[in-house]
């Protein structure tokens, strides 16, 4: 019995010892995980101990895990920064966690070609524009939001028509005739600028502007003009779905309305002075005073948009679903843009070794476009300049004055009535999708295959009604149809590994195939007799048709990239790409492009240790390499013949294109030197210097330079051009207090352009009908024009300078000279500021271009000085020369205005691109609603102010001639953002 009690005592003491020992080597950790966004519990947060063991939080955000003292626990959730805690020595430990959104993580990621990189580890020149700069812009497309945002990126619009896209150039113009726009990549697939308005700006996560060879060379033959990579949104939050609703309502008016045409009183005075009084009843006409700018342009063109998105993620799946509606009236009559769009981005981890996904967009557009760019009495934009102020477009009852009933008293036709009887509309359908699969073949070895599908179908329908008197009882209907199909298949193999956590290697091999097919059809019929039945089938005869107009283009590519990182101090990368294109002949079908880049992270050097407290970034980068340009029409290398030729009454075929099997790629060699510094985590300064040389420039060459064989032009590789420049970008947090912050930003870009070689030793070539000339040693687009010298005060004659600087009254082409001005802006940039106090934010962003010139063709008509006296004229003609001794720059009546330097105007401008005032309701107040996680209201103005010396309706434009241009609009919108 004694032995039994001794045994029991021993067992109990041993058990107590074991329990005591265990209590000293394990800790029960528990707590609640909430979101910093709204303070609500987070479900599904992973709590891991570093050995692969862990738990996830419950529906209420609770967790409980038992680990050893000293264990570091990591709390992680998609869309949030990781949180870490070291478990102390204790029996129990309660630790509540507040998860911070991974805004900084997203900001630290840079999207590059075929991948992403952490900011500060990229040797190339890459500028990133995040979603907050794009999603609230009240425009149909994202392009306008980029103006003034990126150093070296020039964004200009040749029209303010709502559906039109802007023109972009990165670091100047590299080519004379070939394409000068960047390559646009949407979720890995090439798109064109015409597709901009199909993308809802709120669906964009980020845009990366790739500028130098190290960044662009891996895109090869398409990247000489830079690359813009667009990435759409993904689901990120793990605790529950994010539901966002956004709406904007507003109106538009002309952004910059310089209007100096005569009023009725001034017109009557002018007519009396020049003797145009025959048959005029001035007592009656003086009672009518119409400002045709107010008649033609709408100062309250409505704009509305609605967007709804749902996004979320689990440990295996992330998704983003959005639907939107956008409707904008144009400021010019007969123009509007309406868009319905749906996007679904989806990724799922099928297995540890396989992830699959798709990014899909469906889009429908209804477009009406106003005629512009041509001078006619019936097209409203140009007619607004021609109509006399005493021609009233309306009857007394407010209806349109009509040529049908004789109530229209003006010359020709009432442009508003013409527009009503000649409608033109387009409908566009688009499906864009990328399907991809990621295979984790082996540790750090992945293979990705992606297939892109881009299909668009556009139809156009125009009518002219039989009841319209000028049609003499016969109507017209025209239909057009065009289809485009772009298929792209990309395969990449990526292997990444490190040695001793010091040497980091990353290798990429890839293959890409692209096929692009287009076809169009159009038909026109006439003879319709009923306005309501004005269609193709109701005409009595077909007057024109165009069918089977197809075009195909294909490309095959192989590429690779190698990257090396030593201890986060030294970075090196090299890329190589081979492209084969159907646009070139058998002699030069393949092109090879490559680049190298280096970056030195000074901050991580030992000798910079004492500077790290106040210097958060110090990097120097250098890159050099080549990229190509193949943007020419299809089939230009082929010698072609065409049927339908007639010779002495017999039909036959005739040569129409000489062909050139030696046609090859345009090649641009780019070198870039960059300096990137950050101070006190509040001031960042980036300075970059670059030099580009384009050789084998693609140009449609006049064959008279080389031979006379009956052909006018032939595509060939003609010469060389250089672009050199500098860019500086500054971002600063001026003040950062508890409830107040003030941030500023500014960027400046300068580009010098020079033609260094032309065709077959030719030193100069005048471009017909442009008043510009290509000259070796001079910039592209330099004006070649007669110099206006003013007016002879004795007799009112116009004076010009001849080539020898002598005054002359004769205007001769032989006296034209290069005047040193170009329509390509060498200077561009932007600056802005943002003030935030508690939930209130005020931001402003400006954009500008400088030293840019355009010929104002409108003045050729408005200041014709007698040539077009039957149209309304500029009030400046009232100050023309009238008698000996008058000092003025406008000659006497009858001395017509010519295309000379008087029409050449400085089109530099400074524009307040965006001004926004917003208010975010406090999260504490929103918690009471349970459902609403965020609410923001805002008011903003787009293109609010414009400062310029240009006398036209708008200083923006993409070429040397400003002619009857659709002006940019000023927009005022009010918005509401709701987050659930």
Located regions from the model:
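Conserved C-terminal beta-signal and adjacent last beta-strands/turns
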Residues: 743, 822-850, 897-947, 965-980
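Short, small/polar-rich motifs associated with maturation and membrane association
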Residues: 1-344, 348-363, 405, 432, ...
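Active-site phosphate-binding and catalytic loops of NTP-dependent enzymes
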Residues: 154-157, 217, 603-611, 924-928
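Short beta-strand segments enriched in hydrophobic/aromatic residues
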Residues: 249, 314, 325, 350, ...
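Residues on the lipid-exposed face of transmembrane beta-strands in outer-membrane beta-barrel proteins
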Residues: 232, 308-312, 342-348, 433-439, ...
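Repeated loop/turn-to-beta-strand initiation elements of outer-membrane beta-barrel proteins
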Residues: 316-319, 353-356, 444-447, 503, ...
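Surface-exposed loop/interface segments of Gram-negative outer-membrane beta-barrel transport/assembly proteins
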Residues: 105, 120, 237-290, 330-337, ...
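Short glycine/threonine-rich loop-to-helix capping motif typified by GTGT followed
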Residues: 586-590
């Amino acid at each position: 019995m004694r032995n039994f009690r001794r045994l029991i005592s021993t067992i109990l003491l041993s058990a107590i010892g074991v329990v005591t020992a265990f209590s000293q080597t394990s800790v029960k950790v528990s707590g609640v995980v909430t979101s910093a966004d709204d303070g609500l519990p987070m479900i599904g947060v992973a709590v891991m101990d570093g050995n692969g063991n862990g738990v996830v939080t419950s529906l209420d955000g609770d967790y409980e895990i038992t680990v050893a003292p000293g264990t570091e626990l990591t709390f992680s959730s998609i869309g949030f920064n990781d949180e870490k805690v070291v478990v102390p020595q204790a029996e129990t430990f309660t630790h509540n966690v507040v998860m911070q959104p991974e805004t900084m993580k997203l900001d630290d990621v840079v999207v590059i070609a075929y991948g992403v990189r952490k900011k500060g580890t990229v040797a190339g020149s890459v500028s990133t524009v995040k979603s907050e700069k794009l999603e609230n812009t009240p425009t149909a497309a994202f392009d306008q939001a980029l103006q003034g945002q990126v150093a070296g990126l020039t964004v200009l619009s040749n029209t303010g028509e709502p559906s039109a896209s802007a023109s972009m150039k990165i670091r100047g113009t590299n080519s004379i005739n070939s394409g000068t726009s960047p390559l646009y990549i949407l979720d890995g697939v090439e798109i064109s600028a015409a597709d901009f308005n199909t993308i809802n700006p709120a669906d964009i996560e980020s845009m990366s502007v790739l500028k130098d060879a190290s960044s662009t060379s891996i895109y090869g033959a398409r990247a000489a003009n830079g690359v813009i990579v667009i990435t759409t949104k993904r689901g990120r939050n793990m605790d529950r779905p994010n539901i966002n609703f956004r709406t904007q309502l507003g109106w538009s008016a002309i952004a910059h309305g310089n209007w100096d045409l005569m009023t009725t009183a001034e017109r009557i005075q002018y007519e009396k002075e020049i003797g145009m009084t025959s048959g005029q009843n001035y007592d009656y006409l003086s009672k009518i005073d119409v400002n045709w700018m107010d008649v033609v342009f709408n100062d309250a063109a409505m704009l509305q948009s609605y967007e709804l998105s749902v996004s979320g993620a689990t440990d295996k799946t992330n998704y983003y679903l959005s639907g939107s509606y956008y409707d904008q009236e144009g400021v010019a009559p007969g123009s509007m843009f309406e868009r319905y769009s749906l996007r679904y981005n989806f990724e799922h981890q099928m297995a540890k070794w396989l992830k699959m996904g798709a990014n899909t967009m469906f889009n429908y557009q209804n477009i009406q476009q106003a005629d512009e760019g041509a001078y006619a009495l019936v097209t409203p934009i140009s007619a607004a300049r021609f109509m006399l102020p005493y021609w009233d477009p309306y009857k007394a009852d407010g209806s349109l004055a009509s040529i049908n009933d004789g109530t229209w008293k003006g010359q020709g036709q009432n442009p508003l009535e013409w527009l009503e009887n000649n409608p033109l509309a387009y409908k566009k359908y688009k499906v864009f999708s990328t399907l991809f699969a990621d295979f984790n073949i082996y540790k750090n070895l992945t293979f990705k295959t992606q297939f892109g599908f881009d299909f668009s179908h556009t139809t156009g329908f125009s009518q002219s009604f039989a009841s319209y008197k000028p049609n003499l009882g016969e109507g017209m209907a025209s239909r057009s149809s065009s289809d485009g199909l772009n298929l792209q298949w990309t395969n990449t193999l990526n292997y990444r590994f490190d040695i001793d956590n010091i040497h980091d290697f990353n290798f990429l091999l890839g293959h890409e195939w692209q096929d692009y097919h287009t076809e169009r059809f159009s038909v026109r019929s006439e003879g319709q007799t009923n306005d309501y039945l004005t269609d193709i089938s109701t005409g009595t005869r077909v007057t024109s048709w165009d069918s089977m107009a197809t075009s195909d283009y294909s490309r095959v590519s192989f590429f690779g990239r190698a990257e090396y990182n030593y201890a986060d101090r030294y970075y090196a990368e090299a890329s190589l790409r081979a492209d084969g294109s159907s646009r070139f002949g058998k002699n030069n079908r393949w092109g090879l492009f490559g680049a190298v880049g280096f970056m030195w992270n000074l901050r991580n050097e030992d000798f910079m240790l004492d500077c790290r407290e106040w210097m958060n970034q110090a990097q120097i980068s250098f890159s050099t390499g080549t990229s190509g340009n193949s943007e020419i029409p299809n089939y230009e290398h082929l010698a072609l013949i065409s049927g339908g030729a007639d010779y002495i009454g017999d039909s036959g075929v005739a040569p129409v294109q000489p062909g050139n099997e030696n046609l090859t790629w345009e090649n641009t060699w780019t070198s870039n030197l960059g300096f990137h510094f950050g101070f006190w985590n509040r001031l960042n300064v980036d300075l970059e210097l670059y030099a580009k040389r384009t050789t084998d420039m693609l140009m449609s060459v006049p064959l008279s330079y080389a031979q006379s064989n009956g052909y006018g032009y032939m595509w060939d590789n003609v010469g060389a051009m250089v672009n050199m420049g500098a860019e500086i970008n500054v971002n600063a947090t001026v003040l950062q207090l508890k409830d107040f912050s003030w941030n500023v930003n500014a960027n400046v870009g300068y580009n010098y352009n020079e033609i260094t070689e032309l065709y077959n030793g030719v030193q100069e070539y005048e471009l017909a009908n442009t008043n510009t000339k290509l000259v070796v040693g001079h910039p592209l687009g330099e004006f070649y024009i007669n110099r206006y010298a003013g007016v002879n005060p004795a007799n009112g004659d116009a004076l010009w300078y001849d080539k020898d600087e002598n005054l002359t009254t004769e205007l001769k082409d032989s006296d034209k000279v290069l005047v040193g001005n170009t329509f390509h802006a060498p200077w561009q940039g932007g600056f802005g500021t943002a003030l935030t106090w508690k939930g209130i934010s005020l931001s402003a962003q400006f954009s500008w271009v400088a030293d840019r010139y355009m010929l104002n063709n409108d003045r050729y008509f408005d200041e014709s000085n007698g040539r077009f006296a039957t149209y309304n004229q500029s009030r400046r003609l009232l100050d023309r020369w009238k008698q000996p001794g008058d000092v003025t720059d406008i000659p006497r009546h009858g001395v017509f205005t010519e295309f000379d330097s008087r029409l050449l105007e400085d089109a530099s401008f400074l524009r307040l691109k965006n001004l926004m005032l917003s208010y975010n309701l406090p999260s504490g107040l929103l918690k009471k609603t349970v459902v609403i996680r965020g609410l923001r209201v805002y008011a903003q103005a787009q293109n609010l102010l414009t400062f310029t010396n240009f006398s036209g309706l708008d200083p923006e434009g993409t070429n040397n001639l400003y002619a009857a241009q659709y002006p940019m609009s000023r927009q005022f919108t009010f918005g509401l953002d709701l987050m659930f």
